[in-house]
């Protein structure tokens, strides 16, 4: 006969019904957050050049669309382009934060680059760091780069061309 578990004086089944999780194992932190597919991606792939602004307008919550606008503005490398890039990147960043929270993210934990739908947010975050540097906001630049490092070592390496000096932390980010 298997032992019984009791919670609040209610029978909840035999102990054998418990998962066989290693109770001595330590969890490294919150689980990775995986964003849902971005509907703008298919449209951009099919006819992004011809209909780019139309697609952005149709998908204002797409971090990828805002990241692409920011990256394009950064290529101009002028005061106007840099300010525009900052605004576009900040929009993509905030749209991404909204979606991350709806996907269970609680302000910390990995946001893996390897999961393609996460890339729009991560690209917006990096573009925000670059644009912040160009307009002289080094505090914002450093905050964004640290957030990127904490969220995804792979994204940091891919986007900056640098490798991590230290292992990625748990992804804690005050918001």
Q: Can you say where each PLM-predicted feature lies in the sequence?
A:
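N-terminal alpha-helical interaction modules that lie
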Residues: 2-103, 133-175
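Amphipathic alpha-helical repeat elements characteristic of tetratricopeptide repeat
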Residues: 46-49, 119-123
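Solvent-exposed loop and edge beta-strand segments that line ligand/cofactor-binding
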Residues: 54-58, 112-117
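Start-of-helix signal in alpha-solenoid helical-repeat scaffolds, especially tetratricopeptide repeats
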Residues: 63, 115-122
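Acidic, Ser/Thr- and Gly/Pro-rich intrinsically disordered linkers and low-complexity segments
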Residues: 100-115
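Acyl-donor binding region in acyl/amide transferases
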Residues: 120-126, 134-138
């Amino acid at each position: 006969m298997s032992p019984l578990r009791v919670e609040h004086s209610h029978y909840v089944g035999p102990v054998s019904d418990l998962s066989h999780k290693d109770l001595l194992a330590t969890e490294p932190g919150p689980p990775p957050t995986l964003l849902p597919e971005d509907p703008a991606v298919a449209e951009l792939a099919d006819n992004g050049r011809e209909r780019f602004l139309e697609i952005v307008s149709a998908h204002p919550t797409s971090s990828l669309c805002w990241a692409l606008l920011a990256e394009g503005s950064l290529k101009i490398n002028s005061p106007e382009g840099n300010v525009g890039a900052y605004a576009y990147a900040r929009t993509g960043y905030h749209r991404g934060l909204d979606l991350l929270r709806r996907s269970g993210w609680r302000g910390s934990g990995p946001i893996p680059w390897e999961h393609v739908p996460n890339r729009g947010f991560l690209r917006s975050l990096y573009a925000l760091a670059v644009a912040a540097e160009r307009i002289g906001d080094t505090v914002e630049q450093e905050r964004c780069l640290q957030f990127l490092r904490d969220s995804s070592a792979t994204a940091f390496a891919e986007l900056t061309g640098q490798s991590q000096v230290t292992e990625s932390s748990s992804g804690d980010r005050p918001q």
